Amino acid sequence: MKNIMILSGAGLSAPSGLKTFRDNDGLWEEYDVMEVCSATGFRKNPKKVLDFYDARRAQLQNVKPNHAHEKIAQLKEKWGKNLFVITQNVDDLLERAGCKDVVHLHGFLPELRCLKCEGIFNIGYEKFTDKQCPKCKSKDLRHNIVMFEEQAPAYATLYSLLHQTSLFISIGTSGAVLPVEQYASMCEKSILNIYEKDVNLERYFDKIYIEDIISAIDKIALDIENFMKDGNV
């Protein structure tokens, strides 16, 4: 059986009410992105960065998975190991929708990482204050997020799975961080979902939905069905 990859970005979680720094409002309005999202910023003022991620965790607690998260969870349940679910998002909305085996390329907001033993543990939506590593008891901790100027270890997993993928689906990402047009070219068939027209990106894909993911996801699910039957989208 052929394999499918769904790679998602901020456009997947935006309908749930989660904003990114590109929206430049809400939580992000109060901060300089490079001060709170870069390795340099973290070295200069770790408390400011950790406070920022505390605020993001609190925000995450107040939103819910949307129809697209739930549909992807259903698709994963149906296609199992033949569907790779990869996301650039650091939220837990796919998991809360019931999706299994999600690969988070840029880290996971509910988790902290121990700088002493490299252990990773989940604190849910709690604040960073007074936490200690359950493994080595160290309090030398940080958020488990890949910041600007840092390596993303999960990219190795992404590229490994891409070489096994026949249908590539890009959801809610502009291609500014990852070269999704290259990924589309590596696969037999490809589908693009973006909110605004982008001719330079569209030309690499076989099928395009320029619309909100909430209205596109059921069509994409049908495309997957058709692809698994006869190899077409």
Predicted regions and their residues:
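Conserved catalytic core of sirtuin-type NAD+-dependent deacylases
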Residues: M1-V233
